[in-house]
UniProtKB/Swiss-Prot annotation:
The keyword Membrane applies. GO terms for cellular component: plasma membrane. It is found in: Cell inner membrane. Residues 32-49, 90-144 are periplasmic. It comes from Salmonella typhimurium (strain LT2 / SGSC1412 / ATCC 700720). Belongs to the DsbB family. One of its GO terms (biological process) is protein folding. The keyword Acetylation does not apply. Keywords: Cell inner membrane, Cell membrane, Chaperone, Disulfide bond, Electron transport, Membrane, Oxidoreductase, Redox-active center, Transmembrane, Transmembrane helix, Transport. Required for disulfide bond formation in some periplasmic proteins such as PhoA or OmpA. Acts by oxidizing the DsbA protein. It is a multi-pass membrane protein. Disulfide bonds join C41-C44, C104-C130. This is Disulfide bond formation protein B. The chain crosses the membrane at residues 15-31, 50-65, 72-89, 145-163.
Length: 176
């Protein structure tokens, strides 16, 4: 299996699949926001940014998957999945154990050189409360689903990094 993961990491298909899954999750988030009229909170916006990081890692890995650039993509992937996992956990704890002392910010804070809230306010402006439970599916709230999604991204990323030590088998058609 590790050889297979190594082989997949050297092809564009797996990287593009990862970018596509993150894009699909972003589209679902925008559907919830603009069609179902759910208000995203600050942690939702940060989790959305972590998903953009996973998508960016997929695109970076797809550029040149047979070169060392894929290691840069793996670092971005692991960092984004880890930060997303942390944010989803914090968001889940705020929802499961609401407290007036543990709240999220009123607006998302982005660096001055990357004012996403000004560039794309439809995507990056928060208007909801982190403790409010707006949506659930199969008894899980949205941050709990994101906890599982980011955990899956992180587990697969770690497996792919470990798989880099196992060289893929060379396919020899005639067995020489």
């Amino acid at each position: 299996m590790l050889r297979f993961l190594n082989q997949c990491s050297r092809g564009r298909g797996a990287w593009l699949l990862m970018a596509f899954t993150a894009l699909a999750l972003e589209m679902v988030a925008l559907w919830f926001q603009h069609v179902m009229l759910l208000k995203p909170c600050v942690l939702c916006i940060y989790e959305r940014c972590a998903l953009f990081g996973v998508m960016g890692a997929g695109l970076v890995g797809a550029i040149a998957p047979k070169t060392p650039l894929r290691y840069v993509a793996m670092v971005i992937w692991i960092y984004s999945a880890w930060r997303g996992l942390q944010l989803a956990y914090e968001h889940t704890m705020i929802q499961l154990h609401p407290s007036p002392f543990m709240t999220c910010d009123f607006m998302a804070r982005f660096p001055d050189w990357l004012p996403l809230g000004k560039w794309l306010p439809q995507v990056f402006v928060a208007s909801g409360d982190c403790a409010e439970r707006q949506w659930s599916f199969l008894t899980l709230e949205m941050p709990q689903w994101l906890l599982g999604i980011f955990a899956a991204y992180l587990v697969v990323a770690i497996a792919v990094v470990i798989a880099q030590a196992f060289k893929p088998k060379k396919r020899d058609l005639f067995g020489r």
